[in-house]
């Protein structure tokens, strides 16, 4: 309901899609859905997808309203930063559970719905939101975040191989600096962050929405298991 998820939701709405958004905080999820409804039909399905029970609840409420799913964007995520000597087990458990396990189990739970979407003549799509920190090394001590996003990129490949036979295309987006609550530097110090980006600016809504629309559209139907890096060139500058 915020940040990158909101950018993608708005982009899909502008293309005529009916969009369901999910977030743990019901009030925020409802408010965002109400705001985005100015662009098209946007429905709020608040819930906690970090648990099996939360995923099942979300799926049941979705199925009460829809008989198929055309596009699933796995965007829920968490980060944790701490010095190497102090990095706690909780910082691994929370981040890996949400960043790697949740995309797998949510896709698994919605497999039947995606199959129904694929049966309409156009492939269904699963888009996992990874990070450039899973592609190249960030100097910040976010050990579990970097490892989980690298794992999600590889999981995207593995899932893509299995689900392609079902007419379900799995891809990923690896965002760079986009203003969000998770990336507060890009949100609060965009000019400073932009100095480290070859393109000279942080990402904007249309950059992220355009990437997701491409992958979910007919133009992206032959892109299977790939990760689209959307970062203004940062990954190459790190290399």
Positions of the model-derived regions?
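Active-site helix of classical SDR
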Residues: 107, 148, 156
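Short C-terminal tail/terminal secondary-structure segment
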Residues: 213, 224-239
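Canonical Rossmann dinucleotide-binding motif of NAD(H)/NADP(H)-dependent dehydrogenases/reductases
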Residues: 1-20
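Short, small/polar-rich loop/turn modules that mediate ligand/substrate recognition or access, typified
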Residues: 164, 169, 223-225
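Residue(s) in the substrate-gating loop at a strand-loop-helix junction
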Residues: 131
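Substrate-binding pocket helix/loop in short-chain dehydrogenase/reductase
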Residues: 83-84, 88-96, 193
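Alpha-helical segment proximal to the catalytic Tyr-Lys
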Residues: 112, 161-162, 221
